[in-house]
Amino acid sequence: MDIIETAKLEEHLENQPSDPTNTYARPAEPVEEENKNGNGKPKSLSSGLRKGTKKYPDYIQIAMPTESRNKFPLEWWKTGIAFIYAVFNLVLTTVMITVVHERVPPKELSPPLPDKFFDYIDRVKWAFSVSEINGIILVGLWITQWLFLRYKSIVGRRFCFIIGTLYLYRCITMYVTTLPVPGMHFQCAPKLNGDSQAKVQRILRLISGGGLSITGSHILCGDFLFSGHTVTLTLTYLFIKEYSPRHFWWYHLICWLLSAAGIICILVAHEHYTIDVIIAYYITTRLFWWYHSMANEKNLKVSSQTNFLSRAWWFPIFYFFEKNVQGSIPCCFSWPLSWPPGCFKSSCKKYSRVQKIGEDNEKST
């Protein structure tokens, strides 16, 4: 036995490195001592990860972001600014209609301009009421749908900005070019000739009645270029279709029929020239498509030499509203009002998986 132990000791000394400075070897601490010192858990965790990667070599490690950023911040204060912008331009439109009304030439002196649609289609008196009723239905459907949208603040500011900009354009076109009435059936209110107080009353009457004929507030002439009714009918349909599920084809079809029938009824009633309707449709659809293309594409939000859309005068306003919105808005719905947290709390006791296993073990013993 002594000979065997001596041989093992000599073999151990031969296997050690020749460097005299490294002759001391630190003894390995037992596992219990490492756990006491708090050093056992990280080593066991790292060794477990290494074993897991060896066992599952096909797994791909994904780096998680350090900070989770909201891709669609609500920013209701921006929506409030867009709402004020829309209301201001709508009120400005009523003021401009009142001003332009004083410049409309009498129909006896300036007869209606020739219009091909009017040459082939006779006037139907009740058609304009149908157009306004369709517009009211579409606006009601859109407001109801908007209330149930999850990201209603972002969609709301888009709608307010677009409709405000369209009515700002309408103020400009009405003021620079005053067209005669489209038909001899028009009964325009008498001119006030500088009576400021009466003009204010007319403005308030237009605002309170929504500028609709069925409410008796559409008594002024001159707001022909371009058609505000066409703007409303077209824009509400575009927003309804854009922010509703794609498989709601029946819903889209009904809204499209309401919009198309309303626009046709404007012409059948001879309330607007055909050019008024064409320009209104063109400007509304282009502004809607341009805005949403820029909002959905990250590269179009940057002002550059190749991005010609960034040269629009409203691009700084657009960037202010959309700079924090990352990508296309998903079609998600939620309740308009959030219930208190305690309303739907269950009185039943909740168990974790660990607690359930422990109780099962107790029952088995």
UniProtKB/Swiss-Prot annotation:
**Entry's Gene Ontology molecular function annotations:** ceramide cholinephosphotransferase activity; ceramide phosphoethanolamine synthase activity; kinase activity; sphingomyelin synthase activity
**Residue ranges, annotated region (Disordered):** 1-52
**Which consequence is recorded for altering H229A?**
Completely abolishes enzyme activity. No change in subcellular location
Q: Give the UniProt keywords, A-Z.
A: Cell membrane, Disease variant, Golgi apparatus, Kinase, Lipid metabolism, Lipoprotein, Membrane, Osteoporosis, Palmitate, Sphingolipid metabolism, Transferase, Transmembrane, Transmembrane helix
- Compositional bias of kind Polar residues: 15-24
Give the positions of lipid attachment, kind S-palmitoyl cysteine.
C331, C332, C343, C348
Instruction: Output the InterPro entries linked to this UniProt entry.
Output: Sphingomyelin_synth-like (IPR045221), Sphingomyelin_synth-like_dom (IPR025749)
Regulation of activity is described as: Inhibited by bacterial PC-phospholipase C inhibitor D609.
- This protein's source sits in the domain of life called Eukaryota
Mapped to this chain, the residue ranges on the Cytoplasmic side of the membrane are 296-365
Q: What is its main location?
A: membrane
Q: What is the tissue localization of expression for this protein? A: Brain, heart, kidney, liver, muscle and stomach. Also expressed in a number of cell lines such as carcinoma HeLa cells, hepatoma Hep-G2 cells, and colon carcinoma Caco-2 cells.
PTMs per UniProt: Palmitoylated on Cys-331, Cys-332, Cys-343 and Cys-348; which plays an important role in plasma membrane localization.
Which GO BP annotation is one of this protein's?
A: ceramide biosynthetic process
Task: State what changing H272A does.
Answer: Completely abolishes enzyme activity. No change in subcellular location
What EC class is this?
transferase
An example GO CC term for this entry is: endoplasmic reticulum membrane
The pathway where this protein functions is: Sphingolipid metabolism
Give the family, as the similarity comment puts it. Answer: Belongs to the sphingomyelin synthase family.
The entry's function note states: Sphingomyelin synthase that primarily contributes to sphingomyelin synthesis and homeostasis at the plasma membrane. Catalyzes the reversible transfer of phosphocholine moiety in sphingomyelin biosynthesis: in the forward reaction transfers phosphocholine head group of phosphatidylcholine (PC) on to ceramide (CER) to form ceramide phosphocholine (sphingomyelin, SM) and diacylglycerol (DAG) as by-product, and in the reverse reaction transfers phosphocholine from SM to DAG to form PC and CER. The direction of the reaction appears to depend on the levels of CER and DAG in the plasma membrane.
Q: What else is known?
A: Overexpression of the human protein in mouse causes increased non-HDL-sphingomyelin and non-HDL cholesterol levels, decreased HDL-sphingomyelin and HDL-cholesterol levels and increases the atherogenic potential of non-HDL lipoprotein particles.
Disease field? Calvarial doughnut lesions with bone fragility: A rare autosomal dominant bone disease characterized by low bone density, distinctive X-ray translucencies of the skull, multiple fractures, elevated serum alkaline phosphatase, and dental caries. Patients present with childhood onset of primary osteoporosis and typical sclerotic doughnut-shaped lesions in the cranial bones.
Q: What is the recorded name of this protein?
A: Phosphatidylcholine:ceramide cholinephosphotransferase 2
Organism, scientific name: Homo sapiens (Human)
Lineage of the species this protein comes from: Eukaryota, Metazoa, Chordata, Craniata, Vertebrata
